[in-house]
Amino acid sequence: MKYTATDKTAKEKTKSKNIKTRVKPGYHLSLGIVVTMLSVIVLIPLASVLVYSLKISPGDFVALIMKENVRNAFITSITSSFIAAIVNVVFGLIVAWTLVKYDFPGKWLLDGLIELPFALPTAVAGITLSKLYSGTGFFGKGLGKLGIDVAYTQAGIVVALVFVGIPFVIRAVQPVLEKMDNTYEEAAYMLGATPSKTFFKVILPELRPALLTGFGLAFARGIGEYGSVIYISGNSARHRTQVVSYVIMQKLSYIDYASATAIALVMLVISFLLLLFVNIVQVKQSQRTNLL
């Protein structure tokens, strides 16, 4: 029986695959640990939110979400998170660009300070921001003379969400800028393109997936933020400065777990759909970029 070159190649690939499988010991154990940890840390808690929220009938669920204070809290959280995410994308890109493209004294310190919102307790951030932007604060006093109130308004919520969300954008964009090939940028300059045209036509398309990722993470973080917001927002239903996380804490303080988990479920679905949309757009954008 004769063997063709194709048969020989197939046998070599099968042999190589078998060897590769054998040199990876502990596969089933590792997979079991990963699945168990994900289940305990992520899946079971998320499933419990769904289970508790099902204790409310569909009619009561809709009535709860449509209550004026709950509805306004969702509107405030979503709009504030969206505005803050847009601001974070703009300023996060500028900071990441500065850190990657330029050398200056204290660069290492600035790069390290970016991680501060991650490490700083959110309650401490909220107290600090509320003091700075209050009527007697360092920033609030000057803004007050211009007739601009930040503390205990929706603007204060946006400021807090910008503070906690900007590291997501910077850390998403910075590695892409560091690995970006400068050949296309230099070619654009040689062909007579202006710096602004080079940025928008050559550089920005490469950064778009990272910017979308940073936007999605900052937005999702903003919707669920609690500690840094409650101290600067005022938490007033009449002035529409309550956020969803504060309403959930109110329900929990009243031992109303079903209502709290129902509201949390809606917030969870919104965040999941947003991140899913961002990931889909990111994948399509990456595929389109690779085809160019």
Language-model features: where?
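Interhelical loop and adjacent transmembrane-helix boundary motif
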Residues: 22-26, 61, 68, 226-279
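Transmembrane alpha-helices
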Residues: 32-36, 116, 163-165, 169-181, ...
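Membrane-cytosol interface at the C-terminal ends of specific transmembrane alpha-helices
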Residues: 148-189, 215, 276, 280
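Hydrophobic alpha-helical transmembrane segments of multipass integral membrane proteins
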Residues: 40, 75, 79-91, 95, ...
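Periplasmic/extracellular loop-to-transmembrane helix junction in inner-membrane transport proteins
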Residues: 20-24, 28, 49-86, 101-102, ...
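Transmembrane-helix boundary motif in ABC transporter permease subunits
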Residues: 18-22, 83-114, 127, 131, ...
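C-terminal transmembrane helix and the adjacent membrane-cytosol boundary/short C-terminal tail
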Residues: 2-3, 22-25, 29-33, 44, ...
